[in-house]
């Protein structure tokens, strides 16, 4: 009895010409993903500044000198977190760095698919992606709701998409 009689034996390999023809599209996608990572870094830095100003306003009535000094430090860029990209073999790693050069990983972004992962450790992401930066609705939500501490990366965060 032939169990494979219903299987269509089409060739599943890609020809070299097809591979070359789609290479430009793959490169464009990877460049877009890197651009979105840079935009995420910028949004995270802006959120840190906004949150620092909000925390400085908390001291307005109790210690106005501290508040004024803190606002000067924020404008001068002191005691700020800087977000940058470290690219590996498979992922872009969004890294948060302090002035004292201590680093921590904020998230990982898959270079080929654009999937955004919460960091499981300094070297590895969690298995399940939280968002996809190539999907417009998810990307816009991430840029509007990202926070420097990473609360938006938890599964029970506000996203309902």
Please annotate each region the language model reported:
Residues 1-2:
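Acidic, gly/ser/pro-rich intrinsically disordered tails
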Residues 5-83:
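Negatively charged, low-complexity tracts enriched in Asp/Glu with abundant Ser/Thr
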Residues 72-107:
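Exposed beta-strand-loop-beta-strand "reactive/processing" segments of non-cytosolic proteins
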Residues 113-143:
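A short, surface-exposed interaction/processing loop segment used at functional sites
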